[in-house]
A protein has these predicted regions:
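Helix-adjacent hinge/juxtasegments
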Residues: 47-86
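Short, solvent-exposed amphipathic alpha-helical segments in soluble enzyme
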Residues: 21-24, 48-52, 106, 123-127
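Structural motif
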Residues: 9-10, 36-39, 90-94, 111-112
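Glycine-rich, aromatic-bearing surface loops/beta-hairpins
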Residues: 105-150
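Terminal and domain-boundary regions
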Residues: 28, 45-49, 53-54, 131-134, ...
Length: 150
């Protein structure tokens, strides 16, 4: 069964959070697709993942690359799954893909300071529960550690 994790960002940016979530995914041996909503945003995330920390390396590419199928992390703007990922991150209110049930895990990261993003996340939550997915809600505590909320 697909597990869907909703990560509620407040007073933090996707750029601050995404690298560590991707690192944890790679540690677990997962292949990942990160779906954003525009070419420009995917390119900005691509640039950020190369430079976010001097002592780190996240092997990744964009969906345009010829070797996308060989990479553990692919940044995309469409519902394709070029690297046969078992985990899909949805950012910037990217919609749930039609094949959501084919993933082990979907990670929906949304900006809780943006009313439109919050409304889109609520709609996605309802859609996921209707589809019978296991859904969990995560929010950072005052130290920035992710805590599951019930």
């Amino acid at each position: 069964m697909t597990e869907v994790l909703f990560y509620h960002l407040q007073d933090m940016t996707l750029e601050n959070v995404l690298p560590s979530l991707l690192e944890k995914s790679l540690e677990r041996g997962w292949r990942v697709v990160v779906q954003s909503t525009s070419d420009e945003r995917a390119d900005a995330l691509d640039a950020h993942l190369w430079t976010y920390r001097d002592d780190s390396f996240l092997p990744h590419t964009t969906w345009r690359a010829r070797d996308a199928e060989d990479q553990p992390i692919v940044l995309a703007v469409e519902e394709s799954n070029p690297n046969r990922a078992n985990v899909r991150f949805l950012v910037d209110s990217a919609p749930l893909p039609e094949d959501s049930g084919s993933y082990e895990r979907i990670v929906l990261v949304f900006n809780g300071d943006d009313n439109e993003a919050l409304a889109a996340a609520r709609t996605a939550w309802t859609d996921c529960t209707t589809r019978g997915f296991e859904v969990t809600y995560w929010q950072a505590d005052e130290r920035g550690r992710w805590q599951r909320r019930d």
